[in-house]
Each structure stands twice: as structure tokens, then as C-alpha cells.
Amino acid sequence: MMFEHVLFLSAYLFSIGIYGLITSRSMVRALMCLELILNSVNINLVTFSDLFDSRQLKGDIFSIFVIAIAAAEAAIGLAIVSSIYRNRKSIRINQSNLLNK
């Protein structure tokens, strides 16, 4: 019973992240939605790891690895957004075409 609830929560968070990623106009909001998607994947990893083999921690360790990669991705993404804001004075996605300056 608990397994279905956790999978529903993960699917719901993933759907919210995809919807926000598609409809967002701000780069910061897009990064937040991407983090939401990665966290829903982490919930799935831990849930299936506990379901199939609770003695081994493969899903938990992989989830920690994904969290570390997501933290690095967020730091680099925010650095890029702040650099674009300093140069363009806007963080809107449709106004930041870097190819035609």
C-alpha cells in the first residue's frame, strides 16, 4: 500500500517538474523544475531499491550520487544565469539567445 503512494507522489512531482519546465519563462524557475524532476527520480530509486532488495543499498548510494550531481548542476546553472543577467539584464529564456548578439 505504501509503495503505490510513494510512486504516485514521485509521478506527481515529475509531472509538475515537466509542466514547469515546459511553461517557464524564467531560467531560475526552469532550474528549479529540473531539480524537482531529479528529486522525483531519486524518490523512485530509493523506493525500488527498498522494494526489491532492502539489504543492499545500491539505490540509496546511486541516489546520493544523483543528489551530488544535481547540486553541482544547480551551482553551475545559477552561475550561468547570473552571468547572463549581468550581461543582458534579463533572465527570461526567450530574451537570452546568445548566438545573435
UniProtKB/Swiss-Prot annotation:
As its record notes, the protein acts as a catalyst of:
a plastoquinone + NADH + (n+1) H(+)(in) = a plastoquinol + NAD(+) + n H(+)(out); a plastoquinone + NADPH + (n+1) H(+)(in) = a plastoquinol + NADP(+) + n H(+)(out)
Quick check: keyword Transmembrane helix in the entry? yes
**What Enzyme Commission number does this protein have?**
7.1.1.-
**Any idea which UniProt keywords this protein has?**
Chloroplast, Membrane, NAD, NADP, Plastid, Plastoquinone, Quinone, Thylakoid, Translocase, Transmembrane, Transmembrane helix, Transport
Transmembrane parts of this sequence: 2-22, 32-52, 61-81
Tell me how this protein sits in the membrane: Multi-pass membrane protein
Q: GO molecular function terms here?
A: oxidoreductase activity, acting on NAD(P)H, quinone or similar compound as acceptor; quinone binding
**One GO CC annotation:** NADH dehydrogenase complex
Q: Name one GO biological process term.
A: photosynthesis, light reaction
Q: Which InterPro entries match?
A: NADH_UbQ_OxRdtase_chain4L/K, NUOK/Mnh_C1-like
A Pfam entry, by short name: Oxidored_q2
Compartments where located: Plastid, Chloroplast thylakoid membrane
Q: Which domain of life is it from?
A: Eukaryota
Q: What NCBIfam families does UniProt report for this protein, alphabetically?
A: PRK05715.1-2 (NF004320), PRK05715.1-4 (NF004322)
Q: What does this protein do?
A: NDH shuttles electrons from NAD(P)H:plastoquinone, via FMN and iron-sulfur (Fe-S) centers, to quinones in the photosynthetic chain and possibly in a chloroplast respiratory chain. The immediate electron acceptor for the enzyme in this species is believed to be plastoquinone. Couples the redox reaction to proton translocation, and thus conserves the redox energy in a proton gradient.
Family, similarity comment: Belongs to the complex I subunit 4L family.
Q: Partners and quaternary state?
A: NDH is composed of at least 16 different subunits, 5 of which are encoded in the nucleus.
The protein, known as: NAD(P)H-quinone oxidoreductase subunit 4L, chloroplastic
- The species this protein was found in: Lemna minor
